[in-house]
Amino acid sequence: SYDFSNDPRINWLTKILKDNDQDKFLLICRTQQKTAEIENSLRDKINIKTAVFHEELNLVQRDRNAAWFADNEGARLLICSEIGSEGRNFQFCRHLILFDLPINPELIEQRIGRLDRIGQINDILIHIPTIEKSQHEKLAKWNHYGLNTFEENIPGGQSLITQYRERLIDSFENKQNDLAPLIKETKKSREEPKIKLEQGK
């Protein structure tokens, strides 16, 4: 089980919800256990209508929670697990919080796709709370600066993960490991297919 009671990300989450008190937020994390613990940790800090959405709920409960989130007077925060959010679209919401990140960039694209749908009239704001020097921060930096995952769909994102996975994991475990060379190489590899495509026109 997880204990987020002293996690600085919960304090950050409380603040962003208070600062944007008219907006709705979709939060996605990897597991059903995390959804429950995030909800519990928030309850002690802020009074906000919150719905959860995960694979342990039956279809009727999921539909009900999704409808409550879609309602103008309903939940302002929907806390979703990875599997629970599959196949659902929430294009009426523009704030996406990635509480954690999967190592596979295609899964990140799927998360963004929950909001980035036909009918989305706003720019999507992606929030990624990280703890300094954590694995999560390194993964976020690699995705942002190396793969540009949060800005565009990456053709061949999976092959880039295969190519750099071991070095990425090594950077998680080795505190001295500098991420900059890996980011630089990844960016070069990501841009090569684009250059070939341009030349092939």
Regions inferred by a protein language model and the residue ranges of each:
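Conserved helicase ATPase core of P-loop NTP-dependent helicases/translocases
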Residues: I48-E82
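C-terminal accessory region of SF2 helicases/translocases
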Residues: N122-K201
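SF2 helicase motor core recognition
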Residues: T35-E39, I79-C93, I112-Q120
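Conserved nucleotide-binding/hydrolysis micro-motifs of P-loop NTPases
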Residues: Q32-K34, L57-L59, I83-E86, P102-P105, ...
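Interdomain linker/hinge connecting the two RecA-like lobes of the SF2 helicase core
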Residues: S1-P8
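A short beta-strand element within the Helicase C-terminal
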Residues: R88-L101, L125-I128
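Conserved helicase motor "Helicase C" RecA-like lobe of SF1/SF2 P-loop NTPases
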Residues: C29-F53
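Conserved SF2 helicase motif VI
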Residues: N104-I126
